[in-house]
Structures are given as C-alpha cells and as structure tokens.
Amino acid sequence: MAEQVALSRTQVCGILREELYQGDAFHQADTHIFIIMGASGDLAKKKIYPTIWWLFRDGLLPEDTFIVGYARSRLTVDDIRKQSEPFFKATPEERPKLEEFFARNSYVAGQYDDAASYKHLNSHMNALHQGMQANRLFYLALPPTVYEAVTKNIQETCMSQTGWNRIIVEKPFGRDLQSSNQLSNHISSLFREDQIYRIDHYLGKEMVQNLMVLRFANRIFGPIWNRDNIACVILTFKEPFGTEGRGGYFDEFGIIRDVMQNHLLQMLCLVAMEKPATTGSDDVRDEKVKVLKCISEVETDNVVLGQYVGNPNGEGEAANGYLDDPTVPHGSTTATFAAAVLYVENERWDGVPFILRCGKALNERKAEVRLQFRDVAGDIFHQQCKRNELVIRVQPNEAVYTKMMTKKPGMFFNPEESELDLTYGNRYKNVKLPDAYERLILDVFCGSQMHFVRSDELREAWRIFTPLLHKIDREKPQPIPYVYGSRGPTEADELMKRVGFQYEGTYKWVNPHKL
C-alpha cells in the first residue's frame, strides 16, 4: 500500500473552502479590509492576528486584503508585531511571507466614542481601496461596555459604499436577557442580521461541527437518538488551570455566563435538534431555536455551584485558591464550577436529563458530549453489563468512541467493557486540522453564518439562565469549595446520580494508538 501523503494546512483549508463555498464565494479581485477594533488587547494579539496570518500564509484570504488595527493606545505596526508575532509560530522558511503580511498591516489610534477618530479611520481605509468593490469586515475585540458607541460610529462613518460590510461581535453578549436584548436591539437598528456575526469559537471546533454529520449522515444513530434509548446526556467542559491572575475579569461574569450559557448550550442544541431541511445557515439555526424554546428556565434544585480552593499538596498555582488571586474581590462568591440539569420538553427528549458541567482548576482538560444509553431489557448476564455510551470528545485529541460490552477473551462466558474507537489523531494522522478561529473568520469572508449565533438563539439562551443568574446575583449563595486539581464538588456527582446518570468507575480505556 502506498504511503499516505500528508496534506498541508493550505490543502486542508482549500478543500474546506471548495466544499463549502464552491471556491467562488468572494471575489478575489475586490479589496477586502479586515479591521480589528481593540487591536492592542489580549484577544487580538493571541488569537485574531495569528489567525489572519495563518489564513494569509496559506493563501486563503482574497489577494487584495489589508489588515487595519484600531485602538486607543498610541502604537505602530512594529508594536503590534512585537506583541503578536510570538503567537504566530512562524518558521524560518516563512519569513519572506511574514514580511509580506506585515506590509499589508496598518494601525490607527483613536477613541471609541469620538466621531472625529472614526472619520480619520474611514479616510485611512478609503486610501487602501484599489478595486471597483471594497468590502469591510469589522472584528470587535472589545469589552461589551463600548459596543454601543463603537457600532454606532462604525455605521455612521466607516461603512463601505461600494461593497459589503460585516461585523463580528465577541461574547459576552450581555449579562442577562435584558442587557442582551438591549445590545441586540441596538446592533440590529444599525445592521441587518446578515451583516452580524456573533462568534462562539466552540462552533468552529472540529468535533462540534462533526455532530451534525455524525447524527444525520449515519442511519444507525437515527432510530436510537431519542428518549426510548438514551438515559441521559452529559456535556462537559473542564480546565486544569485557575484564573492565573485574571480573576478580576472572570469575577464579573462567573462560569455560567462564561461557558455554560454559550458553549455548552450550543453543543446541547446540536445534540437535541431535529434534522434541518438543508445545511443552509438559517435552516440549521431554525432547528436550534426550536430546541431552546422547549427548555424551561433552570431550577435551582438542579444546580450545584463550586469555587476552587488551594491544594495543600500543590505547587505553584495549584497551591492557590480562587480567593488568593489578588485581582479577585475579597470574599467573592463567584462560582468557578457549575453543574446544571436541563430538560428538552418535546416528544423526542421528554424526561431525558441534559447535564451541563463546567469548571476551572479541575483534574484534566476535557470537553466532550457523552450520551449514556438505557439498560438492556431482559438481563441474562446477571448484572455484569454496564450501560453503552457514545462519546464525542471535542478536546484534547478529538475522538468519537462507543463504550460497549463484548465477551472477555478466554474460557469463560463473561462480558467486559470495551470500545469502538475513532481517534482523529490515528485515523487522520496526516491531516492538520484548522484552528476554530480560522474556520470562523474564513466563514465571515465567505458570508456563511451557519456557525454563528442568531439573535433569537441568543434571546432564548438568556431566557433559560437569567432567572437563575439573577437569584445568584441577589442572594450570593456560598459556593461549595473543591480542591484545585480535583473532579469538582462531590455534590455535582450526587446530582448527576439523582437524575439518572450511572457512573460505574469500572471502565478502563486503553488507548491503542500512540498520539
């Protein structure tokens, strides 16, 4: 058998664009200007600039593309380069291309609420136009407190008159239903829905995007994907590190607003939704909204909140608790861990608990979807059989595997837990997967909104969590302490057991592949 030739990142992304957009979704001859609002910030230097570089390096951006940074700080392109280049992972062979990339960069300093600053920015962009059509893409890498002023000034002063205009908005999209609606109404008064791209980077993850294919391209899953066969669904997001000196920002939002209300709820929608009419953006998002409308507000009896404390045996950061972070307010009751149970009240899912778990300073880095199936009826193996599970692991080491029972090799007729395993690092070992931000920013250039959050999705998501969040903000319940590096509060395990999840602790996964 001939050895499989490794695909380059360019080939992978090129195939992706060809398949999704037939290669002609944007005109290569047009001028495209990518404006990073908040270019001096952490998100810009660690994610946005590196992502634009990767797309530029691999030839995936339109040929006539310019990158303009905008922020209040008095900086130069050289300053931006020094801040962001360490995250580019550029090789010595890529130096000439890197110089070409920064030659297409410029920077404009200005205030976020000053009309004169935006007129200066607009004049700068007009000078870059070379083709008949000029398209502008604004990325708001900014705190939500300045969204209203920035979007108003962009709409009044900086819109292209000869091409399309698109705006990318980063989470958090408000703090609750009221503030989210206020922000959405403001932005919707300035831009059409097809111009607004609310980014949740988890929707750009390989395995999150794979959920639709797994469900709707495999007949074997269709008949069992319902309440008759599935006992519960667990959606997990775990980080092995704490706030690491950035707790002041995190403390304003907490783990529910930061992870559960967006990342985990989006994954829930993809698990629970009905088959869309097409893979078109609005058809997919219509089905997600239908799921959200079937979910009642979270009940406090179905929620566990935790906050990590230092590990007495830990070293370095692990020895510190959340309250030891000097940026965290003294005595803060903000949760760094949350577990919540939701129910999708429709014919397919009635009575099936969807358990959402997320937290910081836990025992591992992991994001996954786990479907646990019901017990086999008519047990003939004397309670030796464990429940089947289908696991979609988003990170690390993307994988799909099924826990199942097989006969243990040998003379005796004993069942044993095993797995059917698709680990991406083994099956696709020569394929380099694009980063989530690469996929999503390429989607914006191509005008595809399938992996972005629509305003009615956002409204329903906040409706589900706002009463709980208001109660937490008002009553400030004391979160349950858990040790840095642990699995989280044992009360969360008890909640999961109460609603029907069975954790046996007997399964030992043996990785047959060396990743």
From Swiss-Prot:
<feature type="binding site">
    <location>
        <position position="171"/>
    </location>
    <ligand>
        <name>NADP(+) 1</name>
    </ligand>
</feature>
<feature type="modified residue" description="N-acetylalanine">
    <location>
        <position position="2"/>
    </location>
</feature>
<feature type="binding site">
    <location>
        <position position="366"/>
    </location>
    <ligand>
        <name>NADP(+) 2</name>
    </ligand>
</feature>
<protein>
    <recommendedName>
        <fullName>Glucose-6-phosphate 1-dehydrogenase X</fullName>
        <ecNumber>1.1.1.49</ecNumber>
    </recommendedName>
</protein>
<keyword id="KW-0521">NADP</keyword>
<keyword id="KW-0597">Phosphoprotein</keyword>
<feature type="binding site">
    <location>
        <position position="509"/>
    </location>
    <ligand>
        <name>NADP(+) 2</name>
    </ligand>
</feature>
<feature type="binding site">
    <location>
        <begin position="38"/>
        <end position="45"/>
    </location>
    <ligand>
        <name>NADP(+) 1</name>
    </ligand>
</feature>
<feature type="binding site">
    <location>
        <begin position="201"/>
        <end position="205"/>
    </location>
    <ligand>
        <name>D-glucose 6-phosphate</name>
    </ligand>
</feature>
<dbReference type="GO" id="GO:0005829">
    <property type="term" value="C:cytosol"/>
</dbReference>
<feature type="binding site">
    <location>
        <position position="171"/>
    </location>
    <ligand>
        <name>D-glucose 6-phosphate</name>
    </ligand>
</feature>
<feature type="active site" description="Proton acceptor">
    <location>
        <position position="263"/>
    </location>
</feature>
<keyword id="KW-0560">Oxidoreductase</keyword>
<dbReference type="InterPro" id="IPR022675">
    <property type="entry name" value="G6P_DH_C"/>
</dbReference>
<dbReference type="GO" id="GO:0042802">
    <property type="term" value="F:identical protein binding"/>
</dbReference>
<feature type="binding site">
    <location>
        <position position="239"/>
    </location>
    <ligand>
        <name>D-glucose 6-phosphate</name>
    </ligand>
</feature>
<keyword id="KW-0472">Membrane</keyword>
<feature type="modified residue" description="Phosphotyrosine">
    <location>
        <position position="507"/>
    </location>
</feature>
<feature type="binding site">
    <location>
        <position position="357"/>
    </location>
    <ligand>
        <name>NADP(+) 2</name>
    </ligand>
</feature>
<dbReference type="InterPro" id="IPR036291">
    <property type="entry name" value="NAD(P)-bd_dom_sf"/>
</dbReference>
<feature type="binding site">
    <location>
        <position position="503"/>
    </location>
    <ligand>
        <name>NADP(+) 2</name>
    </ligand>
</feature>
<feature type="binding site">
    <location>
        <position position="370"/>
    </location>
    <ligand>
        <name>NADP(+) 2</name>
    </ligand>
</feature>
<feature type="binding site">
    <location>
        <position position="360"/>
    </location>
    <ligand>
        <name>D-glucose 6-phosphate</name>
    </ligand>
</feature>
<dbReference type="GO" id="GO:0006749">
    <property type="term" value="P:glutathione metabolic process"/>
</dbReference>
<dbReference type="Pfam" id="PF02781">
    <property type="entry name" value="G6PD_C"/>
</dbReference>
<comment type="function">
    <text>Catalyzes the rate-limiting step of the oxidative pentose-phosphate pathway, which represents a route for the dissimilation of carbohydrates besides glycolysis. The main function of this enzyme is to provide reducing power (NADPH) and pentose phosphates for fatty acid and nucleic acid synthesis.</text>
</comment>
<feature type="binding site">
    <location>
        <position position="393"/>
    </location>
    <ligand>
        <name>NADP(+) 2</name>
    </ligand>
</feature>
<comment type="subunit">
    <text>Homotetramer; dimer of dimers. Interacts with SIRT2; the interaction is enhanced by H(2)O(2) treatment. Forms a ternary complex with ALDOB and TP53; this interaction is direct. ALDOB stabilizes the complex inhibiting G6PD activity and keeping oxidative pentose phosphate metabolism in check.</text>
</comment>
<feature type="binding site">
    <location>
        <position position="365"/>
    </location>
    <ligand>
        <name>D-glucose 6-phosphate</name>
    </ligand>
</feature>
<keyword id="KW-0963">Cytoplasm</keyword>
<dbReference type="GO" id="GO:0016020">
    <property type="term" value="C:membrane"/>
</dbReference>
<feature type="binding site">
    <location>
        <begin position="421"/>
        <end position="423"/>
    </location>
    <ligand>
        <name>NADP(+) 2</name>
    </ligand>
</feature>
<dbReference type="GO" id="GO:0006739">
    <property type="term" value="P:NADP metabolic process"/>
</dbReference>
<feature type="binding site">
    <location>
        <position position="487"/>
    </location>
    <ligand>
        <name>NADP(+) 2</name>
    </ligand>
</feature>
<dbReference type="Pfam" id="PF00479">
    <property type="entry name" value="G6PD_N"/>
</dbReference>
<keyword id="KW-0313">Glucose metabolism</keyword>
<dbReference type="GO" id="GO:0001998">
    <property type="term" value="P:angiotensin-mediated vasoconstriction involved in regulation of systemic arterial blood pressure"/>
</dbReference>
<dbReference type="GO" id="GO:0006741">
    <property type="term" value="P:NADP biosynthetic process"/>
</dbReference>
<dbReference type="GO" id="GO:0002033">
    <property type="term" value="P:angiotensin-mediated vasodilation involved in regulation of systemic arterial blood pressure"/>
</dbReference>
<feature type="binding site">
    <location>
        <begin position="401"/>
        <end position="403"/>
    </location>
    <ligand>
        <name>NADP(+) 2</name>
    </ligand>
</feature>
<dbReference type="GO" id="GO:0004345">
    <property type="term" value="F:glucose-6-phosphate dehydrogenase activity"/>
</dbReference>
<dbReference type="InterPro" id="IPR019796">
    <property type="entry name" value="G6P_DH_AS"/>
</dbReference>
